[in-house]
Swiss-Prot record:
InterPro entries from the UniProt entry: AB_hydrolase_fold, NDRG
Family note: Belongs to the NDRG family.
Positions with biased composition (Basic and acidic residues): 364-375
Keyword Chloroplast on entry: no
Modified residues (N-acetylmethionine): 1
Descriptive protein name: Protein NDRG3
Residue ranges, compositional bias (Low complexity): 330-346
Biased composition (Polar residues): 347-359
Keywords: Acetylation, Phosphoprotein
Region feature (Disordered): 326-375
Organism of provenance: Pongo abelii
Keyword Phosphoprotein on entry: yes
Residues bearing the modification Phosphoserine: 331, 334-335, 338, 341, 352, 361, 374
Sites bearing Phosphothreonine, chain numbering: 322, 329, 332, 355
Length: 375
């Protein structure tokens, strides 16, 4: 873990700040598109070219962020190039959240979370994309989950960071209304992303995102997106009953990797989501020494996890995976069939010495337990 911590500390600042200390969420070799849908215009950024019949990696950011501030530290991380050389990446910005977005006209009705999900099929059609592997954070994770529930044929896999499957309760709603009277939207967003420990322990990171939220995101548009997220419906997903046909259950059908930092405000929500998903195709990754933005603070660990996830789906089998293999520990595991992710198997390869190691003794393996990994 000490070695990983050293990597983390040297990675953050170059990714987030330039030599003058200003924010640096730069895009590289990208094409931008504004695509009209029945629910309004959506801004999309394409990185790379689609590779044959392979799915495209499609990302969706959280409230207070856009694709640059949410994902570029991750996708610009050196080890991610091993993945991006095999996949095109499609970054979706929620309406009005992209850099330089103008304010919506007075009376504009911002799309609901369900409508934001329904803006994605026209995007795929416009770009001639057949399927996706989605990576979503917070609100973006909810949107991609809704999209996968409505269009399972278009989604091969999901990486859901800080996902909350529940509607906002009336107590939470009332609290947010009251806090809105005394707290500005920037502080509300920061409390959504970061726990108290991280707010106090990582002032440079917090200041970077405070300035980004306050200065780079249109504040009127941000309030509309925040209101839409606060008005979300429950995803109404449910864990399949043992022996029951999975088609009768409303749950995610694709391979799913849930990710949360152990200091994130979203821990309880992610654990709740995990309890509702099919354990056969779900992995829960808890990241130690990490808060609300694991893709920014621990890009190395998340990259390694994503490589395993893709390998389990049959992609990039030759990818080198060493960092996570040295550090991972397993709290519970599933006994799954062939062709599935090493994250979801009881036996995994030790890449450093070529041997295999059993994560749990056979008497505690249970096909109906979700695989949990901490690193």
């Amino acid at each position: 873990m000490d070695e990983l911590q050293d990597v983390q500390l040297t990675e953050i600042k170059p990714l987030l700040n330039d030599k003058n200390g200003t924010r640096n969420f730069q895009d590289f070799d990208c094409q931008e598109h504004d695509i009209e849908t029945t629910h309004g215009m959506v801004h999309v950024t394409i990185r790379g070219l689609p590779k044959g019949n392979r799915p495209v990696i499609l990302t969706y950011h959280d409230i207070g962020l856009n694709h640059k501030s949410c994902f570029n530290a991750f996708f610009n991380f050196e080890d991610m190039q091993e993945i991006t050389q095999h996949f095109a990446v499609c970054h979706v910005d929620a309406p009005g959240q992209q850099e330089g977005a103008p304010s919506f006209p007075t009376g504009y009705q911002y799309p609901t979370m369900d409508e934001l999900a329904e803006m994605l099929p026209p995007v795929l059609t416009h770009l001639s994309l057949k399927s996706i592997i989605g990576i979503g954070v917070g609100a973006g994770a909810y949107i991609l989950s809704r999209f996968a529930l409505n269009h399972p044929e278009l989604v091969e896999g999901l990486v859901l960071i800080n996902v909350d499957p529940c509607a906002k309760g009336w107590i939470d709603w009332a609290a947010s209304k009251l806090s809105g009277l005394t707290t500005n939207v920037v502080d509300i967003i920061l409390a959504h992303h970061f726990g108290q420990e991280e707010l106090q322990a990582n002032p440079d990171l917090i200041q970077t995102y405070r300035m980004h939220i306050a200065q780079d995101i249109n504040q009127d548009n941000l309030q509309l997106f925040l209101n839409s997220y606060n008005g979300r419906r429950d995803l109404e997903i449910e864990r399949p009953i043992l022996g029951q046909n999975d088609n009768k259950s409303k749950t995610l059908k694709c391979s799913t990797l849930l990710v949360v930092g152990d200091n994130s405000p979203a821990v309880e929500a992610v654990v709740e989501c995990n309890s509702r998903l099919n354990p056969i195709n779900t992995t829960l990754l808890k990241m130690a020494d990490c808060g609300g933005l694991p893709q920014v603070v621990q890009p190395g660990k998340l990259t390694e996890a994503f490589k395993y996830f893709l390998q389990g789906m049959g992609y990039i089998p030759s990818a080198s995976m060493t960092r996570l293999a040295r550090s991972r520990t397993h709290s519970t595991s599933s006994s799954l069939g062939s062709g599935e992710s090493p994250f979801s198997r009881s036996v995994t390869s030790n890449q450093s010495d070529g041997t295999q190691e059993s994560c749990e003794s056979p008497d505690v393996l249970d096909r109906h337990q979700t695989m949990e990994v901490s690193c």
